[in-house]
Amino acid sequence: MEMRICLLAGDGIGPEIMEQGVRVLETVAGKFGHDMEFTDALIGGAAIDETGDPLPQETVEACKAAQAVLLGAVGGPRWDNLTGAERPEAGLLGIRKALGLFANLRPAKLFPELASACFLRPDIVANGIDVMVVRELTGGIYFGTPAGEETRDGLRTAFNTMVYNEEEVRRIARVAFEAARKRSGRVCSVDKANVLAVSRLWREIVTATHADEFPDVELSHMYVDNAAMQLVRDPSQFDVIVTGNLFGDILSDEASVITGSIGMLPSASLGAGGPGLFEPIHGSAPDIAGQNKANPLATILSTAMMLRHSFGLEKEAEAVEGAVQQVLKAGYRTGDIMDQGGTLVGCNTMGNLVNERI
């Protein structure tokens, strides 16, 4: 298979972890007989320094010409004096919009070898944590209108509007059901249908989409307040969670932090037919940039998500994930996941160790 991939290294540790991600992709290409073409482009602070714009038009065009986009990290204190659309983070928001990415897939998996990092009770951890939160990215209360502030009865009053139409719900539901087919085949749709009209429509459309298109997948529904509790009470009950923008923002962060190893977690943002964007959920860590201390595993696991979701290469994705697990089982650790008895290695060595096991 021929693959065109755009690389957005970004800022801080971005170039270091990107290097390891690319090496893994090159190893996969060599061992499985694929051809990969890489294009580099600027985003975030690096783009500001070079062009004055956190998202140059050339970057947008390069991403649109690719089949998938791999992102390192964006932002850092050297650009803290900038505001709004001038900030590095505006580049990330801009590329998501330019590519029409409406679905964010964030897996929260606890590797057994890192169980000691999890703050949940040992009996809960023993059941395993492997949750995928599918969050709608472009609708809901963050983008609904009207929104703003005005004076009512002499009082400052602010307001936002939560809005979803049936097609927005249907397309995110399809992403969740398709993801579940690649996993354990279970979807839990999270809403607040006992209070919100928008959630009642959400539940109705998710249920209909399940019946019409995905009867082989198990579907359940849960109110968001209960879901937030159940995630810490027994995360093993969940496979794929699908929910709207606001609830997904909260639940995906909750799901990621309960693993205790945020430096291990990848993510994917997908649209309708165009290139997907794959990135680690951690930040740019400027305090350790250029010191060979960064953990590249979240980026490497993001390449596995790319292979699976952009190219349909399940065997190759599993090979990458299996290699990561073997390295952890052998006791190798970067500083952020170091535990008693582990062997401390740097970013480059960790990448080498994974490559050797693919």
Swiss-Prot record:
Record-linked Pfam families: Iso_dh
EC number per UniProt: 1.1.1.85
Positions that bind NAD(+): 76-89, 283-295
Signal peptide region: none
GO CC, alphabetical: cytosol
Location of the protein in the cell: Cytoplasm
GO molecular function: 3-isopropylmalate dehydrogenase activity; magnesium ion binding; NAD binding
Gene3D superfamilies reported in the protein's UniProt record: Isopropylmalate Dehydrogenase
Needed co-factor(s): Mg(2+); Mn(2+)
InterPro entries: IsoCit/isopropylmalate_DH_CS, IsoPropMal-DH-like_dom, Isopropylmalate_DH
Site (Important for catalysis): Y142, K192
UniProt catalytic activity: (2R,3S)-3-isopropylmalate + NAD(+) = 4-methyl-2-oxopentanoate + CO2 + NADH
Cysteine pairs bridged by disulfides in the record: none
Superkingdom in the source lineage: Bacteria
Main subcellular location: cytoplasm
Binding, Mg(2+): D225, D249, D253
Membrane-crossing segments per the record: none
Assembly and interaction partners: Homodimer.
Task of the protein: Catalyzes the oxidation of 3-carboxy-2-hydroxy-4-methylpentanoate (3-isopropylmalate) to 3-carboxy-4-methyl-2-oxopentanoate. The product decarboxylates to 4-methyl-2 oxopentanoate.
UniProt cross-references to PANTHER family, sorted A to Z: 3-ISOPROPYLMALATE DEHYDROGENASE
Family: Belongs to the isocitrate and isopropylmalate dehydrogenases family. LeuB type 1 subfamily.
Identification of the protein by name: 3-isopropylmalate dehydrogenase
Gene source species: Oleidesulfovibrio alaskensis (strain ATCC BAA-1058 / DSM 17464 / G20) (Desulfovibrio alaskensis)
